[in-house]
């Protein structure tokens, strides 16, 4: 129906591609366009206003992770969602990633026994903060990548985080003109007695054959799961080595977990059921991320609070 971008040329190009109306002011789009669903894909720090106003207009809203980068913004969105007629889903798309989905099934089936420990790593090469994201200085590997890992571990554990101790390193990205930290390592205790170690980095070398390094290990009293998602997929060798993108269209339809999460949201609207992940998942996710940043600044453990 409509697309909105603050850059007029981008809005018009997208509108032409999809045959829809173009706007540069989302409030104007909300007021004029005849639509049921709004997908908010603004930079991470700019989610609050478009999400809240979209919900207040009665539309269903899908917002990209993280739901917000501050607790204040996350609480405002969560409150708006509770008051709204429409549904809100935070796009924690890795719940639809097959290895992670199968991990959750194994846990729920009791194959791993009582959960004890998780190790979750998600990192990027320097391409992401230096070339892909124009707003990287207003974000960090913690806020851009760890929302996925934190959500997965909360989902696996069916528990809430209690205490966080985190350590960051910095210097490499700042020397490249990107004002944010390089790496973050966080130890998080949960109220079910389990412990999780989270690791993220934005300074992996671009010589790596993949942009995303992604690994998750879950240890239980009866078993263990490993999910290494960095090396899976097609590798093609000719004059140069190529690692084609893992998600694509097949016979005209989008396939893979980034599409499947969106399909789920649309299904929830059509069938009037609640999304698997909602505003409370988004709020708790942001609370844990903010606790990591707070702990890294203070150099001491902090409680996860909302």
What would you call each of these model-derived segments?
Residues 24, 63, 88-90, 119, ...:
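Hydrophobic residues in well-ordered beta-strands that form the structural core
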Residues 7, 18-80:
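Beta-loop-alpha module in the N-terminal Rossmann-like domain of NAD(P)-dependent dehydrogenases
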Residues 144, 150-232, 259-272:
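Contiguous beta-strand/loop segments that form the cofactor/metal-binding neighborhood of enzyme cores
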Residues 86-87, 94-178, 299:
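Predominantly a Rossmann-like dinucleotide-binding segment in NAD(P)-dependent oxidoreductases
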Residues 1-14:
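NAD(P)-binding Rossmann-fold cofactor-contacting core
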Residues 6, 250-262:
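Active-site loop of classical SDR/Rossmann-like NAD(P)-dependent oxidoreductases
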Residues 37-42, 75, 265-306:
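C-terminal helix-rich "cap/oligomerization" subdomain common to oxidoreductases
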